[in-house]
Amino acid sequence: MSAAGAADVFHRARGRTLDAFSSEKEREWTGPFYFVQGADPQFGLMKAWSTGNCDNGGDEWGQEIRLTEQAVEAINKLNPKPKFFVLCGDLVHAMPGTRWRKEQTRDLQRVLKVVDQDIPLVLVSGNHDLGNAPTAETVEEFCQTWGDDYFSFWVGGALFLVLNSQFLYDASKCPALKQAQDHWLDQQLSIAEQQQCQHAIVFQHIPLFLKSIDEDDDYFNLTKTVRQELADKFTRAGIRAVFSGHYHRNAGGTYQNLDMVVSSAIGCQLGKDTHGLRVVVVTAEKIVHRYYSLDELSKRGLDDDLRELLKE
């Protein structure tokens, strides 16, 4: 697919916002709605993991293609339609500059372009998209392929912030880019606090924590210092939930009024969960989410209790 063709298909983020939604129209609360969250399609990991060669493996990704096609098919069948479909990072397995990256990216774009055009895509960067220690070059490559690496948008009276969590993990090779996101985030959190939006929600790849704010540092979470500072900023600004991936298992916990939601993968499972998607219903008072296996969502769609919430 050409770059121009990709731009036509994906509602890509530019200028730190998402052109799929008019921020002025969307600032007013108009009633309950829902969106779908997925994470880690990570084309190539299943083969790499099965052979024990996660650094250089991943020369096949037919399984991930089929799973992501099933996810897209399930989303397209949903009625009513979700407001958007967010993918929380690790779009492909091949790191920047490595073999198979172009092919994996091409195949993922081919699958994602089938998403109903009335369901905008929201794309979040992960460590495999940018490298564990991103550089200005890897960030630029992501932005050229998928749109801005961090941005905000309004939907139905709720403010959504998309973060580049690699800057929070290791920004040693691009400190100026991290500082720019930090400054932008402070501005956005100030807006969330002052405008008293109905809800404010964050999307990022790496979770703040997996279960508890005071858990030990791990590959799958942010360091204690970073997570505590960020969690405090979020709670002060009234952020209600953070949705992430990265762990390839379902997990999560709470800190004060903040819900940290960790969703398992569309692709490779590292625990006992199933390949799946999370449905998130936003009502005037609360945010209700439920993880569905791809088979469940394909066969039965939204559960009746979630449908009832949409009528409130």
Curated annotation (Swiss-Prot):
Record PTM Phosphoserine, positions in chain: S2, S293
Primary gene name: Cpped1
Organism field: Rattus norvegicus (Rat)
Essential cofactor(s): a divalent metal cation
UniProtKB keywords: Cytoplasm, Hydrolase, Metal-binding, Phosphoprotein
Catalytic reaction(s) noted: O-phospho-L-seryl-[protein] + H2O = L-seryl-[protein] + phosphate; O-phospho-L-threonyl-[protein] + H2O = L-threonyl-[protein] + phosphate
Protein known as: Serine/threonine-protein phosphatase CPPED1
EC number: 3.1.3.16
Keyword Phosphoprotein: yes
Subcellular location, record wording: Cytoplasm
Job of this protein: Protein phosphatase that dephosphorylates AKT family kinase specifically at 'Ser-473', blocking cell cycle progression and promoting cell apoptosis. May play an inhibitory role in glucose uptake by adipocytes.
